[in-house]
Curated annotation (Swiss-Prot):
Coiled-coil region list: none
E.C. no: 2.5.1.108
GO biological process, one term: S-adenosylmethionine catabolic process
Record's protein name: 2-(3-amino-3-carboxypropyl)histidine synthase
The keyword 4Fe-4S is annotated on this UniProt entry: yes
Described function: Catalyzes the first step of diphthamide biosynthesis, i.e. the transfer of the 3-amino-3-carboxypropyl group from S-adenosyl-L-methionine (SAM) to the C2 position of the imidazole ring of the target histidine residue in translation elongation factor 2 (EF-2).
Length: 342
């Protein structure tokens, strides 16, 4: 397996809290690990259910579902704890990657130098345990490395989420992202407008991220919504995405500027569920990535709250929609962590 799932530690915690039945929640990339963990726990006399819905991140814990099916605890794989109220004790397992970050950096040192001498280093939960080692290596190569602390939605300095890039709001000429895919580095580039180099520790490949093409597409969405009179404003019931006050603000703003607007409550936000409504455009006040990454599947224009402000002439510069928190009191431990009901 490519990721660390500390089965014995998880079992120890479950025994400590007296859990007899658990629900395991995992993203699609960790389904095999979830099944393997289930087998191990059942061998140790713990009843296990697997959560089959798509998981979008730490913002979407299945604690409510765990409680409904009589589970004593939830095991959440692949993400770290986000400060949210929980209905059952929940074990967060970051699933650290078993791959060397430094080896990938060594392979791409020439590209990293193009960022400049003062760089900001970021990563995801899967590689966060190697961030200190990465920083030391880069400093030995002559770089001045900044790692931002981030806010209360972040577990560790340097960690990015798809909706939160607070760790990158520090001084630096460019940003180095350590991780796979362009999901996070694209968000970094749009949120900070800095040069972003992504290095994949699994393949050792690099990618330079250009946000301008992406931003042009967003301006096109705003233009398409310019003549819309009826707006559906979507709010999510996922705990870490629930922004009801912001959604109500957007409804009020649209009405103030002569548009019709109605609030729509959803769990998973996608256009197919909205086909029968007569709205001419939508505003997603839930996961900020839905209108940005999935807009091609929408037959109507779909905007973020900040894009609505541009539409109404209240904002000129394009700004990435983030879900930000307050100051973080302490970091999470490196490894599993358990958080109880509140």
């Amino acid at each position: 397996m490519l990721h660390e799932i500390p089965k014995s530690e998880i079992l120890k915690e479950l025994k400590r809290i007296g859990a007899k039945r658990v629900l395991i929640q995992s993203p699609e990339g960790l389904r095999r690990e979830a099944e393997e963990l289930a087998g191990f726990l059942e061998e140790n006399n713990i009843e296990v259910f697997l959560h089959g819905e798509i998981n979008y991140g730490a913002c979407d814990p299945a604690d409510r579902e765990a409680k409904l099916v009589g589970c004593d605890a939830l095991i959440h794989l692949g993400h770290s704890y986000m400060k949210l109220p929980l209905e059952v004790p929940t074990i967060f397992v970051p699933a650290f990657a078993r791959v060397s970050v430094v080896e990938a950096l060594k392979e791409n040192i020439g590209e990293i130098k193009k960022l400049g001498r003062k760089i900001i280093v970021t990563t995801t939960a899967q590689h966060i345990h190697q961030l200190k080692e990465a920083k030391e290596f880069l400093e030995s190569e002559g770089f001045e490395v900044s790692i931002g602390r981030g806010d209360s939605r972040i577990s560790w300095p340097g960690q990015v989420l798809g909706c939160n890039y607070s760790v990158a709001k520090v001084r630096g000429e460019g940003i180095l992202f350590i991780g796979s895919g362009i999901f996070h580095p694209l968000g970094l580039a749009v949120a900070t407008r800095k040069k972003v180099l992504a290095i994949d520790p699994y393949t050792k490949a690099f990618s330079w991220i250009d946000p301008e093409r992406f931003i042009r597409k967003r301006w096109a969405q705003i233009a398409k919504a310019m003549d819309a009179k009826k707006f559906g404003v979507i709010v999510s019931i996922k705990k870490g995405q629930l922004r009801l006050a912001e959604a109500k603000r957007i409804v009020k703003l649209l009405k103030k500027h002569g548009r019709e607007a109605r609030l729509i409550v959803m769990n998973d936000v996608n256009y197919h569920k909205l086909e029968g409504f007569p709205f001419e455009a939508y505003v997603v006040v839930a996961c900020p990535r839905v209108p940005l990454d999935d807009y091609g599947a929408w037959r109507k224009p779909v905007l973020t709250p900040k894009e609505v402000e541009i539409l109404l002439g209240l904002r000129e510069e394009y700004e990435f929609d983030e879900i930000l928190g307050g100051p973080r009191e302490s970091d999470e431990p490196f490894g599993i962590s358990i958080h109880s009901t509140r």
